């Protein structure tokens, strides 16, 4: 029984890890899967079957205030959903304990599975939350978009120090995400259940949601300047999370430092891309 339960838990971990890896490789290689597009920088136009493909940076019709309001509200909803996953893991822990499933690293496998889903599959939780809201709410929160440009990211001017594409999934999935898992597990282990733990975890979940929002804004909506605002908020919330984790346990805060380092690179890259392409954003 214990072996079977452990295998089921491992299978769930592997499935979520595979989803996260697929998403990361998909984001990095999004432009590479398409044939080269016309150069829109000099006024060229192209059409799809029904609608024109707009030039770089034009895949979102909302005003800045409208887009940021929608992104912020969606991030808070997603963060609440992530907290719900953690609560479900906590509620499931006594069930596994009653079945004789041993703890792993001092934590119930149910709680560890919840950590894994939250950290590696936050965007999947966000999609689930979106699907569970009413059509009217989705209409209010979804940005107004138009078809974007194929090969958009490839065509952007980038700094000479732009990291190679293969480094991104390695840093996110091999370095950043596992150390985040260790940090959250550490915080969970050294704090009592209640508001003191809860608000720190919520701040961390908001940081994850803002990271997913940046992916949508930059890659999905093809908005460099607006993406810069979102990634700055994402970066700030990450630094805040590391600080409040460290208040409770210094090691928990330090375990978020690899992510802080990598997001520093990502934020600087977004700033550089904006500086090089702002006349066309």
Annotated model-derived regions:
Residues 243-281:
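Terminal transmembrane helical module of multi-pass membrane proteins
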Residues 1-40:
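N-terminal chloroplast transit peptides
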